[in-house]
Amino acid sequence: MTIVNIESAPAVESAGSSNPRDYTDIHIRWSLKDGEPHVDCVGSLVFPVVKPGERPRPQRPAKVIYQLLDELAGSCFAVATATKDFLIHHAETNVFFRGRFDDRAVDGTWYRLRVISAKPPRLENLGFPMPTIYVEQLMDPAFARGGLIAVMGQAGSGKTNTASAIVVSRLHRYGGMAFGIEDPPELPLNGWHGEGYCTQASVAGEDGKDWVESMRGALRSQPVGTDLMMYLGELRDASSAQMALRAATNGFLVICTTFASDIISGLEAMLNLAGREHADTLAHTLRVAVYQTLLPAEGRLLVDTLTSDGPTSRVGVILRSGDLRRLEDEIRYQKHQVAAEFARMQAARARAA
């Protein structure tokens, strides 16, 4: 099928690039001609990469990118009929895109594509550095016995990057096996990472049963005696939240992301999703709750954490009570402890220098 007749598209003579890595996002608009789908090259949008602190702005595509739009549209068309969210790979440039099929816009049907890294992130080389003290919290070897790490934040705060980096970094340091269950996979984690291996599954977000079945499959196929992780893009419903807690009590280190305005609201959301009767299980499984805020203009990642040593710890007792507002004092206390430890580390470095 002919996706687009490039020669018939009016030329846009503005400067541009055919390298997809020169863009953060590419939005491809479809139009119908004689009942057949075609790409409207002129009506599409590209968002060029900008300098740190600047915000990408939409531009009309230059003619040099029309062939790329055609190729990407063909890849989208092949997968977007089964799911609205998808991952595609442009083989010629080895660039991955996270895509969304948008058929609700008043000006036509769109493929909204985000360029993603071809190299999985690690905690030590995130785009916006995470302080070492928090990295070491997340790399605690004791977590290999199982539990829950929840990465929280608002939209665009880098939750997926951090959660993925936890998986990759722990596989590199400790080996083992990780199961990724996402809608769709947002970063290319599948494959070997040092002595550890990650396998990714793409599930359809419209049906919660797909999530539960994928999680159940991971539980059934766990290798005996191996360090195990389960990475969930996001908890979607009660069944998946309950299954995540079950996995965390069954030897998996479960890593998930959730939208939140702070740590307490994030834990409240998880508990409400799973059911308040699962407060005791959350108290048994929670290892670290991470809340992060991205400040792109300053090149900074602000991080707060809440760690728990189990159901009899101060955090565990509060979680079991169900009154999560009482965590405020513990969060402040732990933040003070982290600040004091950071000051000691800085002083030690100064003496060593």
Predicted regions and their residues:
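Short, flexible helix-loop junctions that flank or precede catalytic/ligand sites
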Residues: I3-A353
